[in-house]
Amino acid sequence: MTSPADLPVAAPAPRFFWEDFPVGQVREFGRHEVTREAVLAFARDFDPQPFHLDDAAAEASLFGRLAASGWHTCAMAMRMLCEGYLLESASLGSPGIEQLKWLKPVYPGDVLHVRLEVVEARPMASRPTVGLVRSRTTVLNQAGDAVLTMEGLGMFRRRTPGST
């Protein structure tokens, strides 16, 4: 994974526009190793539930051992999405996530990657320079098991405004 210091200060010219996300397209990218230190740090700062912070509490929980917060998993997914394509795209942000499911726990030592499937792409009626992309994101662990799914919309500048 790229460190924050390695990220560009100014956005480069976009490689990907709305037209580059046809329905049915599937992209797989990213590699993020989950560390115990990161699980504990995220939990301390953002989700201080005992099963994310304490080995004994985690062992007594449904997780059976220390597990990452689901919100930490979302944050790791977002980082992989940024590095995988968003930082190189004409992204204009997102109006939101419509569905989010945590399917399996994420543990220290897991290695995650992302699969992104475009399920809808349409021009934005009120803004001819913008297109909407609905995507289904799946985060998978090293065994290929889905640990998280989410579906949401992204807004992207169009390369050719007004085209269909």
Label each PLM-derived region with a short phrase.
Residues P95-E98, V114:
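Short beta-strand or tight-loop elements
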